[in-house]
Amino acid sequence: MPKLRSATSTEGRNMAGARALWRATGVKDNDFGKPIIAIANSFTQFVPGHVHLKDMGSLVAGAIEEAGGIAKEFNTIAVDDGIAMGHGGMLYSLPSRELIADSVEYMVNAHCADALVCISNCDKITPGMLMASLRLNIPVIFVSGGPMEAGKTKLSDQLIKLDLVDAMVAGADSRVSDADSEQIERSACPTCGSCSGMFTANSMNCLTEALGLSLPGNGSMLATHADRRELFLEAGRRIMDLATRYYQHDDESALPRNIANFKAFENAMTLDIAMGGSSNTVLHLLASAQEGEVDFTMDDIDRLSRLVPHLCKVAPSTPKYHMEDVHRAGGVMGILGELDRANLLHNDVYHVAGSNLADVLARFDIVQTDDAAVHKFFSAGPAGIPTTKAFSQDCRWDSVDNDRKEGCIRSREFAFSQEGGLAVLSGNVALDGCIVKTAGVEVENHTFIGSARVFESQDDAVAGILGGEVVAGDVVVIRYEGPKGGPGMQEMLYPTSYLKSRGLGTKCALITDGRFSGGTSGLSIGHVSPEAAAGGTIGLVQTGDRIEIDIPARSIKLAISDIELAARRTAMEALGKDAWKPLGRVRQVSMALKAYALLATSADKGAVRDTSKLV
């Protein structure tokens, strides 16, 4: 029988000092011997997805203590990618993932916690906590802050739905009046919660359901809705159940590595492809798999991308549907249910919400169940009232959306596309692969041949796009923005948004060793591996080169001879210490970022740190 980890600091005369300190935190005599449950919160007033989380830890703690545990809360950092976008702040976003993972590990191991509740929400926080959870391998459950309501406003007497990307595009589009731009800005992000489309934050929170580590509704129930309160309370009760199963009954199915195993990672990626999730999820799943010692690679993602149809199309791939609409259609359980009926899912994997995924789907897939309580749960809708308060409204749709022919979630027969929403491309530009979010690419652009327009940084690319250097037919190449070369692998939402604002969104392609915001759409190809700073071919592309992109064939090619390519590589290597560095780029890089760059791997490895370099 496993012994409570916390016994290390609570048992024995030699731990009198530790017990004295525990007592100073409120632990009583009869509490010693109970499991200590760590609550990793991520409240901050900087981030709308986290601004409402201050009291969530207390909710979870109350449920834990009622169930017989000791709850101890701590906080992690949380970076808002949208606010950090377009300036040097974005260099810190991806590296913050490793800091979050490390901080959770440090707190949990330093204090010998027995189990963990992760209260996350936005882009790097859920992945960082997921990496830590699989690294620690103690009972864990995730509960996120929930998505923001979609923005709504009336322009030209027409009611339109909005999100963050609309504000960015309008702000850069000279054809949009100042008044309309301001109106869109004021309406785009009306409430607390993670941005309202299928961007990185919501994608990752959905994937925790598929991995088996969070409760149904975690990825889709609005932050403002009163029903979300129960998810926090149930998370507290469930973590005590998981801890009891493991520590009292030696049930290893309660551990995250046995829940989020290889089959579960396949399920998560299958969901991601079916819902056209953010391309950033590829980075985070690869990184998390490595932490859990799961042999899940780009090859697996490529294989799945050829099998899974696109069943759920959400902003930014369409203005029609946002996360509130996904929830009405049954949320993640609705998508997983359709994948299960298409025989594309492993339904025998463990899940924190039931004995296995099949059991959870039987109870929570609105197509399978007539349970009135479940249908009521998924009818929770938006109020349309600006607020930063959680659980502030109890509005409901008249009915759930179970139309699998023309609704937000489709069956395989009526899929938006039989091709999934993400694809892995490879070729001489990206020998180790790159990622494109096909859900956001117009069908006519699935094959594209253009002339390279090379920029050594995102800043130069933005200036070039806004300055008219980029024209229809160009392939914008932004390099030295990978994990090592940036450092930090910046998101390229501004370049793609500015291409749209200049009417080039469907007339140009963009490839980069950086990454894209979940809000990106268009022919935007990121995660090019190896990155330029690691000797990748993208570092050898020259302006005017012909680049051929073929999504159906999963290929991306620099159309020059092997002899010419080899000659360019030889010339680059001859530069010695100046090889594989951006020409003329002036960028202040802090010591913290330099330390990150020393260990950073390319995107095909999840941009994790290569600790073998420390040996």
From Swiss-Prot:
GO terms for cellular component: cytosol. InterPro entries: Dihydro-acid_dehy_C (IPR042096), DihydroxyA_deHydtase (IPR004404), DiOHA_6PGluconate_deHydtase_CS (IPR020558), ILV_EDD_C (IPR056740), ILV_EDD_N (IPR000581), IlvD/EDD_N (IPR037237). Transmembrane segments: none annotated. Keywords: 2Fe-2S, Amino-acid biosynthesis, Branched-chain amino acid biosynthesis, Iron, Iron-sulfur, Lyase, Magnesium, Metal-binding. Homodimer. PANTHER family: D-XYLONATE DEHYDRATASE, D-XYLONATE DEHYDRATASE YAGF-RELATED. This is Dihydroxy-acid dehydratase. It comes from Shewanella halifaxensis (strain HAW-EB4). The lineage of its organism: Bacteria, Pseudomonadati, Pseudomonadota, Gammaproteobacteria, Alteromonadales.
